[in-house]
């Protein structure tokens, strides 16, 4: 039985080696000009350094090129993708067909992973993009376990799912927070380093707090809870899911390292010793709950809910 890749989104190049030592086998990085909702901002120099560190340790580096592109940016894609290929990244993650077209012209040997956040909901669509050149499909977070397994059974490409972290609920290209501050006569710095400013939308009826931040790609509203299925990995591993992702957006490096250690142990035991995996489930959940940020509970997302599509 194969072990799935353990993919983590690091906050900086300083995270790469500690996360590899914690058990990560792949990383998703990028810069906000081309990628969406990343845990950290990786310049070209950072990407090159991340590849150097990861490859030395036998890990992979993927770069997010999954932003919503308008005419003003499409002319840059070819040159950026050529840089990624030259830097030796293991794949570019895309959603916009413009990236696929640019890659064919400027970086034909660069491996591509297809990810659109919400529309990876069936194996026909996954296979369509596979036949267009994608080696992997990243599934929507709103799918339940049965749907994920069925997709994997019929997929012609690798399948990636998110197993831990917050998920995006809303994105607008508009500067909603900046406009609100401007209306109040205030100034807001929307640089990437300011996104951990602790702003929330408060739903009093459900008593939920939704993290909200703004960057070059607009305004993003995130889920009030973190997905955590460390105790529900059996069916996914048995199905042969290729990659498990821990999303580190709005998380501290120390948190990511501890969670990665636990998922590494869980994956290894689930493959090698099911009885011991079963025995340790409660301990992992308790340990994760003990390091969760204030007011952020964990749940199983849509894995055991009726699919909303």
From Swiss-Prot:
Its EC number is 3.4.-.-. One of its GO terms (biological process) is proteolysis. GO terms for molecular function: peptidase activity. The keyword tRNA processing applies. InterPro entries: Peptidase_U32, RNA/ubiquinone_mod_enzymes. It comes from the Bacteria. Involved in prephenate-dependent formation of 5-hydroxyuridine (ho5U) modification at position 34 in tRNAs, the first step in 5-methoxyuridine (mo5U) biosynthesis. Belongs to the peptidase U32 family. This is tRNA hydroxylation protein P2. It comes from Bacillus subtilis (strain 168).
